[in-house]
Amino acid sequence: NNIEYFSMLEKWDKKLSKSSVEAGIYVEWQSQLINEMNKKFIPEIAKEYLSMQLFTVIDKISKMNIDERKELLNKTFNSSIDKLKEKFGDRSDNWVYGQKDFKHVKIYHPLEKVVNDSIKEIIALKLYPRGGDGYTPGSTSNSLNQESGGSFRVIIDTGNWDNSFATNSPGQSGDPNSEFYDNLYEDW
């Protein structure tokens, strides 16, 4: 009954783009697969502390007999579609990966939760859509809110210093009134 969504994945470019519905389907399916494999292989006493990595999940799935594998993949795919419908509604065009309630980046100022609203408005950084995950280049973590990643990056041309590039997210200044407070954040 979810064949149309599987067909979308077959035609997908395999990029976890922030504007991709297929990326949203894939990431939710991956999450359901990992959760199901955790239930199956991690002892109850250790579940609070351990989770299987994708590489291990793929390895274990590849070693299953064909019927068990089909059952697992169908079950988790269907549950991923159910979860997406529950969270975002029946229309698949609402399942875009990079959105506020899915994959995004929101850096919180350390004082944001303790200051009044007028100061919070000055220091708070915006939320931006994000693509990728912890298994893609740029390693943006598997959290739906990117909480980690390379925020300081530098390419130095020692033969011509003026030809060097650097970025420091969210910006080069700690002063919220400066134009350089968050000028590098959106591109990060």
Residue ranges and their predicted role:
Residues N1-W188:
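Long, compositionally biased non-active-site segments enriched in small/hydrophobic residues and glycine
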